[in-house]
């Protein structure tokens, strides 16, 4: 089915937190769910009298049974809060035509994270086109494993989707959207979400059901995603403060962050290679040509015939617990042997190294230049990219970036088998090569970053024509 057909965010959630038995999946929330329920929610007119569904037909993750009926829970008296009306003005002010969904960053396993907000839904008549635009924005990324965060609160009477709309949208959704979705976080769930889920539950596979995790606070979300900073709309933050009044901000003042970081680096064991500046590694580890030992080991292991041509290399997520265990061993100074380690774990270890650097490999200084890549005239891009890389990158960053690019080019050479084109590799590595100093990177910013990396991969011979020691030569 065409990915651009009707689609809606996966809104429903289970009545209780699911148990995720796969070590790769984040654990569900253990905190209590909030039962703050507004008067205006999803259109539930089809719940008590659903449209006839096909009998015993398998559709994706759903198995359609004969005439499913919802049995409403008795003695339920949810609170009818009016926070959506209170926050409506803020949500409307925040919404812009280009902000249908947000790119929130990458999680601890390097998977892209996208945020969808109920407060941004348009009226029902425009909802189908709205979600089609969301599909266009994230479709290039869903060929890889990805995470979806749905911020539930903020619906109004004129934009609440019907249960039938959700059902039809899911059935028509492209396979990659369903298959490669690894976790669906529902933030600030309500009682009605659980009712909706009970209605759909008989038709949903156990595999898909395990992907859903309830999140009751933004602190819990940050911890689950492994992101200390989340750029979220004010109305979401205000609602979180209201629902979690006892939770105080855990972020210390910037000055104390800087002091703590300096103290931590001072106490850091010289064997550390993860979570430290690249210069720190070069100064304290046996780095040949500024290449950290663990990076060289990963690249050597992944370059072997039969490994480098693995289909989906760098797309699939490796076992998170194995990756974390290897990182701890490396930071203790142990000599790790990767010969018997799964290819996706090694690939995840390499991505984790880049993501854990104290400063991105392409440096904060180049962020504005790189995010302006698509605005450059095409005839000037080669010259500008070459100058940025040769003249503005510190020597150790230049050497490591060159080393990884040359490896990724070898991965590209096997694209007939591994399906990893320059564009696919750019989507995976772009957010791990460069990110913003102060805020999360938006979809508008990630596009030029990925395009920049794609350009480098396709034009690497021209960019790296001369040796690093000759980088001071001017470029005409």
From Swiss-Prot:
SMART domains: RhoGAP, SEC14
Phosphoserine modified-residue sites: 29, 31
A molecular function (GO) term: GTPase activator activity
Residue ranges annotated for the Rho-GAP domain, each copy included: 276-464
PROSITE patterns to which the protein is assigned, alphabetical: CRAL_TRIO, RHOGAP
Reported function: Functions as a GTPase-activating protein (GAP) for RhoA/Rho1 during gastrulation by converting it to an inactive GDP-bound state.
Protein name: Rho GTPase-activating protein 68F
């Amino acid at each position: 089915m065409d990915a651009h057909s009707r689609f809606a965010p996966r809104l429903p959630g289970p009545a209780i937190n699911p148990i995720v038995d796969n070590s790769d999946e984040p654990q569900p929330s253990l905190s209590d769910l909030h039962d703050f329920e507004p008067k205006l929610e999803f259109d539930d007119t089809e719940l008590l009298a659903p449209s006839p569904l096909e009998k015993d037909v398998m559709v994706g993750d759903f198995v359609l049974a004969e005439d499913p009926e919802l049995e409403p829970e008795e003695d339920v008296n949810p609170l009818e809060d009016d926070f959506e009306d209170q926050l409506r003005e803020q949500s409307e002010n925040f919404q812009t035509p280009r902000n249908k969904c947000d790119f929130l960053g990458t999680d601890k396993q390097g998977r892209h994270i996208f945020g969808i907000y109920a407060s941004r839904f348009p009226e029902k008549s425009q909802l189908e086109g709205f979600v089609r635009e969301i599909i266009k924005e994230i479709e290039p990324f869903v060929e890889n494993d990805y995470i979806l965060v749905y911020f539930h609160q903020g619906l109004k009477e004129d934009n609440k989707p019907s249960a039938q709309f959700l059902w039809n949208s899911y059935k028509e959704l492209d396979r990659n959207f369903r298959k490669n979705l690894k976790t669906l976080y529902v933030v600030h769930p309500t009682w009605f979400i659980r009712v909706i889920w009970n209605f759909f539950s008989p038709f949903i596979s156990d595999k898909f059901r395990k992907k859903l995790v309830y999140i009751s606070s933004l602190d819990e979300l940050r911890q689950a995603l492994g992101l200390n900073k989340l750029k979220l709309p004010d109305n979401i933050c205000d609602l979180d403060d209201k629902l979690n009044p006892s939770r105080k901000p855990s972020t210390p003042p910037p000055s104390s962050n800087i002091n703590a970081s300096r103290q931590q680096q001072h106490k850091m064991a010289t064997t550390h290679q993860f979570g430290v500046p690249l210069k720190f590694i070069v100064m304290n580890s046996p780095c040949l040509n500024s290449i950290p030992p663990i990076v060289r080991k990963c690249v050597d292991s992944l370059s072997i015939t039969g490994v480098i041509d693995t289909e989906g290399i760098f797309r699939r997520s490796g076992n998170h617990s194995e990756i974390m265990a290897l990182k701890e061993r490396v930071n203790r100074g142990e000599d790790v042997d990767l010969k018997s380690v799964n290819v996706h774990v090694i690939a995840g270890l390499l991505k984790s190294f880049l993501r854990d650097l104290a400063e991105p490999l392409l440096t904060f200084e180049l962020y504005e230049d790189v995010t302006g890549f698509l605005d450059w005239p095409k005839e000037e891009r080669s010259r500008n990219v070459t100058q940025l890389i040769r003249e503005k990158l510190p020597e150790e960053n230049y050497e490591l970036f060159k080393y990884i690019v040359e490896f990724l080019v070898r991965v590209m050479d096997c694209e007939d088998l591994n399906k990893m084109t320059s564009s696919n590799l750019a989507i995976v590595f772009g957010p791990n090569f460069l990110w913003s100093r102060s805020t999360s990177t938006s979809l508008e910013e990630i596009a030029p970053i990925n395009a920049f990396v794609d350009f480098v991969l396709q034009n690497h011979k021209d960019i790296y024509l001369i040796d690093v020691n000759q980088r001071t030569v001017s470029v005409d």
